[in-house]
Amino acid sequence: MTTIVSVRRGRQVALGGDGQVTLGAVVAKASARKVRRLYHNKVLAGFAGGTADAFTLFERFEAKLEKHQGHLMRSAVELAKDWRTDRILRRLEAMLVVADHEATLIITGAGDVIEPEQGIAAIGSGGAYAQAAARALLENTDLSPKEIVTKALTIAGDICIYTNQVHVIEQLD
């Protein structure tokens, strides 16, 4: 799996992920890019799960953003609806975290669109570790969202065997 974490402080949001791709018990790639900017660089998105499945979902989500003029919630709900009802999409195994200046959402293959509390979203095998670290840092420091994401990914990578220390982090100011 992987670790994807997003932290929001006001309208500033950062989203990051590690680069490890595993095939069974073997690390197949250490520097995969699981975080992207979408819709004219106004939306951040990261995935955990099957890489090919995630790319399909990125394409679908970007099409929804275009159709709905960048409206994050509506695009996420429409993607989740398609994901839940389409026979082919239903088989895709991935989760997404998406964020813009206004909201952060987790989108699942079960059709869930969740807006997490406290401005923190985390998915993947190291998600719980990253979420705990990010929450402690957000509540007890003045670090920027990008600094918190970096530290949370580092901590998750130290604990989770499916998460490495090669990070890609994007930020919207």
UniProtKB/Swiss-Prot annotation:
It catalyses: ATP-dependent cleavage of peptide bonds with broad specificity. Na(+) binds at G157, C160, T163. It is found in: Cytoplasm. The keyword Cytoplasm applies. Its EC number is 3.4.25.2. The active site is at T2. It is an enzyme of class 3 (hydrolase). CDD domains: protease_HslV. SUPFAM superfamilies: N-terminal nucleophile aminohydrolases (Ntn hydrolases). GO terms for biological process: proteolysis involved in protein catabolic process. NCBIfam families: ATP_dep_HslV, PRK05456.1. A double ring-shaped homohexamer of HslV is capped on each side by a ring-shaped HslU homohexamer. The assembly of the HslU/HslV complex is dependent on binding of ATP. This is ATP-dependent protease subunit HslV.
